[in-house]
Amino acid sequence: MKKILLSFMAIFISLSVYSQETTSDVKGFVSDSSGNSVGGASVSVVYVPTNAEAKASSNSDGYFVVSNLKSGGPYSIVVASAQGTKRYNDVFLSVGAALSLNVVLEATDEVVATASLITRNVAPGPSTVFNLADIEAAPAWDRDIKDVITQDPRIFVDESQSYRGFNCNGSNPRYNALSVDGIGLNDGFGLNSNGYPTSRMPFSYDAIEQVSVEFAPYDVMYGGFAACVVNAVTRSGSDTTSGKFFYEFVDDSLQADSLEGDSLTINPYEETKYGFTLGGKVPEVENLYYFVAFEQYDDFDPYERGYVGSGQANESSWLSEADFNRIRQIAKDVYGFDPGGLSKGSPSEDVKLLAKFDYFISDQHRAEVVLNYNDGFEITPADSWTPVFESHFYERGHELQNFQ
């Protein structure tokens, strides 16, 4: 029995920490027209997409807090007592922050307020929050949240490197911390330079609803970083079933073969991205919602180096085809090793799947189950030397599974 109780305590403690990192709060002070605090005022916070309601009431000093709310919106907030009623429409909450309200009740009919003019989100330290509108409007050509968060001048993405690492206030990407719905996705062994534990972003771009970047959060729940903390929150289903599909394609046939009359040497390459999202309400189950996001990336990058006469974009003047074949034959005859032929290019693949279920149990409790899966590989050179043999390249794969 004690073991069972301890298990439940551990679960609730972890859920408490999780909710603080990835959800939002609404807090405030209720007063009448004379400035006196109003105790016992009812507070109703309704998440409009699902009509899920969270309730609270102000204490004897007029203060109230509604915790563990899903970030985003829109929300409708109603504060009511014998002194009057006030409604806030189109309220949007920021991940990891608390919305602060100063509610003044008047003895008149219901007052409807514009939330954006009288509310503010309070975060624990310097931070930036990007909502769904920011994510959808960003020119994310690589389908990566780096293309969103780089709008903050304190973040720099190194476009000169293929891995596109992002630096917070000039620090190495390995000093950052990344979480998705409270799941830590850090590069624990420091094998990558892009700030991720995988070769590409380990979750679907279309699955993200909000991203926050916190540079110096003064909160004990944060740790394991020295630069910044990136918190991403995934989308959820609603009462309306909706989805989307995308397909992107580019290859060498879409590139010009000459420039100002001079012919260009173009090696074959191809890149394809496609995926879908689907979200809605689970049929015949009250207050249960689902969201699924899938994304796949296939790529073939040409290797542009070769011997003289190979037709590659960059031919080594010191290496002829005869020398290339002689080196290969010596390796086979003397050392019993075949270094392979001329490398033509390197394929890569990346598959992402995210499934999420939200269950609104009551006006005080909400359950969330998230599965995130990422699998892929890339062909990469063994070191920075620029040879042309196939044996110099190897397959570097990764597989990531998270469930909570």
Where do the protein language model's features map onto the residues?
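Periplasmic N-terminal accessory/gating domains of Gram-negative outer-membrane beta-barrel systems
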Residues: N59, Q83-T85, N89-S100, V112-S236, ...
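Transmembrane beta-barrel wall of Gram-negative outer-membrane proteins
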Residues: S242, N267-F377, H398-Q404
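Extracellular loop and loop/strand-boundary signature of outer-membrane beta-barrel proteins
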Residues: Y196-P197, E260-L264, P339-S343, V388-E395, ...
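Outer-membrane beta-barrel pore domains and translocons
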Residues: S116, E214-A216, F246-V250, A293-Y297, ...
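Outer-membrane beta-barrel translocator domains and adjoining extracellular loop/strand segments
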Residues: Q255-G261, Y303-G309, S348, T380-V388
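Periplasm-facing N-terminal accessory domains of Gram-negative outer-membrane beta-barrel systems
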Residues: S19-V112, N121
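Positively charged n-region of N-terminal signal peptides that target proteins for export
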Residues: M1-I4
